[in-house]
Amino acid sequence: MPKVVALYMPPSVEYVISVFSVLRCGEAFLPLDPSWPRERVLSLISSSNISLVIACGLSSVESHWLVERNVCPVLLFSMDEKLSVETGCSSFVWPCKKERQRKFCYLMYTSGSTGKPKGVCGTEQGLLNRFLWMQELYPVVGEQRFAFKTSVGFIDHIQEFLGAILSSTALVIPPFTLLKENMISIIDFLEEYSISRLLAVPSMIRAILPTLQHRGHNNKLQSCLKLVVLSGEPFPVSLWDSLHSLLPETCFLNLYGSTEVSGDCTYFDCSELPRLLKTEEIGSVPIGKSISNCKVVLLGDEDKPYEGEICVSGLCLSQGYMHSSIESEGYVKLHNNSLCNHLTNDCGSQLYYRTGDYGRQLSSGDLIFIGRRDRTVKLNGKRMALEEIETTLELNPDIAEAVVLLSRDETELASLKAFVVLNKESNSSDGIIFSIRNWMGGKLPPVMIPNHFVLVEKLPLTSSGKVDYEALARLKCPTTGAQDMMQSNGTNSLLQNIKKAVCDALLVKEVSDDDDFFAIGGDSLAAAHLSHSLGIDMRLIYQFRSPSRLLIYLSEKEGKLREDMQHNTTQKLDHKIESQNGNGLVSRTVPLHSGVTSGPTPSKLQCEKNNSPKRLKIDYEKFSPKRMKENKLWDSGFSQIQCAFSRCNKVHSPESCSNEEANREYWSLEIPRNQMVSMQEIWKVHMESCVDASPLVVLKDSKTYLFIGSHSRKFSCIDAKSGSMYWETILEGRIEGSAMVVGDFSQVVIGCYKGKLYFLDFSTGSLCWKFQACGEIKCQPVVDTSSQLIWCGSHDHTLYALDYRSQCCVYKLQCGGSIFASPAIDEGHSSLYVASTSGRVIAVSIKDSPFHTLWLFELEAPIFGSLCITPSTQNVICCLVDGQVIAMSPSGTIIWRYRTGGPIFAGPCMSHVLPSQVLVCCRNGCVYSLEPESGCLVWEDNIGDPITASAYIDENLHFESHELLASDRLVTVCSSSGRVHVLRVRPSILSRDSHDSKVGEITRMELQADIFSSPVMIGGRIFVGCRDDYVHCLSLESCR
């Protein structure tokens, strides 16, 4: 028998290292979840004859209590600690040198019907067989990423990290505590890290489904999430249907198994489900057929040849239970004459595990799960014996008898319900339930604590004297719904609304004002349900755990919003208000050329609907352009120049006005060379939902317009000077792409997630024409003034050329992948370049109709960022999601490559004021400056937070120049964590220049949510969208 080493730590790098260290030593590991009650942890350590406990040193509080108990040796281990002690030759003997082979390599406990957990002895061959089967049928192709996020108490967690390590695939481990407290954050995690494969239980997917549906068809998940494995619970067909509509390109697998069979033994590919549903009426997705080297049979009655108990044999089989014979407690030898309709040959006289689950074989040969005959259930993917919960309850001195059942509501949401008979001397007041719940919290994991308690005088019995479970199941407790309560105008107070929502989430009749949500049965799934019902951030439920405390917080916030509304609506436009530093924004002044300091990441987004004002009033004295020397741009009315500014320094002008005119020296603003600079917010406009789109700023008729849309489907035209609204309209789908104007500036063009491209009147927003593509539109349209065409790509893999005057599509091009990146037009060569998520780059001749393809090139990774053309060489700059920056010639050959240190999701930035630099922003937090002609690195600057948006170079504001050198320019960069940085960049770089002389941060500001919008910076003003539901206007200010 191998020695057993317990691992007391959550999913982490330390955990993965510890697992492989134990295996390398030839021993077995036992996962211990730190969230389990201490009494349960000590019980498992005692019953397993543990030789050593390895605990994560970062969890000092949780680890040290084990040392104090002195039950066995404890090793504290942390990756953050530097090991300075030199180690000599190890005394360990590697497995290959040992005379014996270990019987099992891991020990995992499952709930037992006797009331005691049972330790399953799992084998290496079972784990490897599961991995090799997956790798053969669903191999890892290209650069993918796995996520390790499942609790270590669940058998499926092993394949999460084992599959990544054995296939040399990147493994991303999210903050386990954050996911536990805010289950909805898993969506942002999957998007941010472009996770390719996800393993989850259906109940978790059901909990986050409303948020997924609210966000609509999420292109980022559609492009990155290749495979989703569902296991641990029945997978409803209705849930698959919802998921498939949101993620049509994602492969969904339904796996079935248990800890005794290495986690999984059958599978069903949901791509076969539409075909199957034509011939079968089923409510849950089949569990399918056996995986490689596993044998699955049905043991049942002869009169039902295609139905019976699921029995499993093969390489997946474990070595039985700790301290038990292999041929006991469910492990039996079966013969052919006892099998009703076995699914494999050669199954006589073999050892099988009787799962206790019953299945039926469909005409296709697939198995479908139909239930259990014993009282073992699965909740949130965790298998548990109801008898163990009942045995624990009856240990409570106030309880005489207890029965626990699994119940489901009309939405198939499962929960545990306990029917309790109290001792005669016990007090049956409301406080007894609270006391029992607290007592249970120290005995069992949270998932095993009943959600609802029912006090009964006696348990109903059958005629044979046994507990009548069916009669108990019919004793339904009334629940109250929470739908639409937050919009109710009736007499119910906010407190009653909150309590109703809590009752609905916990499936209980009533709660008191001071009940602790988690003490009375709440868990992360119930918290997700409650947060969705109330429309609040899930983390608030963990912070304000009772209805009364949550009421106080929400009331204070509501009062503050109402006060702000009343104050702002009574002010006129020219009235002054105080500095906006009180609204949660952080502004600081940094000395010129100072280094970037990395601070803690701000809190994540809190998307909350409110009635806050459309804009904030401006203190014209405080933010007077006079603070900047001769600020002609924002003070003179812009003369009669017409031009449009959009992300990546893309400037579009009518045919009568060249781009150079729009940026001529007349518009130049100058700052003294040694002047200190700070940043202030001068207005923000509420967009009712997240603003991921980048702004389009247009100068026309002596006015400055800003066009932008949000996830709320609202598209707005705003006065860029004051923040007042010109007009707004509601589109049919969510907006994530940027807008563009047509050649004569008479219309503005914007796409949405419903696949529609709208042509709106510039002055009024009224609809002129709309074009329907076959997929979502996130790509910013591009205008070709010479031909009066609008070019735009779609998720349907097609590039469209649209004649907005004739209102028709004149050309289509299949691009082999979804088009997120805006095309680039080379007017000199009359060529257009387009890239797709397949990595394909295509050059099209647009000189004469019909248009035709010049060349096609397949690059190694998807392209999400817009393309850029260098003015001097007309090379095309492409940024790949794998971190490569590639320059291609007009003839389609690669000129140079540069590999950054992380993924790139945004396009490069170039400007005539920095002609010798291409700026690229990377997810690793770095901004790279590359030479356009050679690809050599000019400088690299790390702002300390991930970046998913493009930079912007202010072409109108600069520092006073030295006699021999060009003026230093200003560049704005926004991190995805919500920080807006302004860098000072030297245009002319000498080889002897230090890093600080090339680039340095001069100021920064912190917004209150994530930023995925690429900024636009004109004359010291920065326009950017944010996931706090606002579009912001920030202004640089010279410090006196």
Swiss-Prot record:
Modified residues (O-(pantetheine 4'-phosphoryl)serine): 524
Keyword flag Phosphoprotein: yes
Organism superkingdom: Eukaryota
Residue span, Carrier domain: 489-581
Keyword annotations from UniProtKB, A to Z: Phosphopantetheine, Phosphoprotein
Short name of one Pfam family: PP-binding
InterPro entries in UniProt: ACP-like_sf, AMP-bd_C, AMP-bd_C_sf, AMP-binding_CS, AMP-dep_synth/lig_dom, ANL_N_sf, Beta-ala_Activ/Resist, PP-bd_ACP
Family the entry assigns: Belongs to the ATP-dependent AMP-binding enzyme family.
Record protein name field: Putative acyl-activating enzyme 19
Native source species: Arabidopsis thaliana (Mouse-ear cress)
